[in-house]
């Protein structure tokens, strides 16, 4: 099963980065592979949302429940979609008021062999550039 791990240090606060990741409804604005997103439920503890991947001929949607520990952690767990397994987390660690480290980990397995062969190379590319998209968007909206 593929694992994606990424660690970066950014010149943005943990609050800014946590909020950017939690605003799933904004993903289509800055993630080129995201063909749409819909928040199904949101409260202080969880965000349930569906994301539509529309990229390089792939047209798939999945739904996750994201358990939140503001502002330090978001855990992702699959509810529905073309995966047998999709789970991961974001960890935001304060370095000082205007900087933090971000640790992203994603573990996934597609539900069948055909999907794995068709979608896995594209999903791997998406997952490996995921954090970069958030850093670029944070630099843009927080103007640092």
PLM feature spans:
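A short, structured loop/turn motif at beta-sheet edges
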Residues: 14, 41-45, 67-72, 91-101
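Short, highly charged C-terminal tails/helix-capping segments
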Residues: 136-144
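Hydrophobic/aromatic beta-strand elements that line small-molecule binding cavities or substrate pockets
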Residues: 6-8, 37-38, 62-67, 87-94
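Hydrophobic ligand-binding cavity/cleft-lining segments
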Residues: 1-45, 144
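Glycine-rich portal/gate segments that line the openings of hydrophobic small-molecule binding cavities
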Residues: 38-79, 133, 137
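Beta-strand/loop substructures that line and gate deep hydrophobic ligand-binding cavities in soluble
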Residues: 78-129
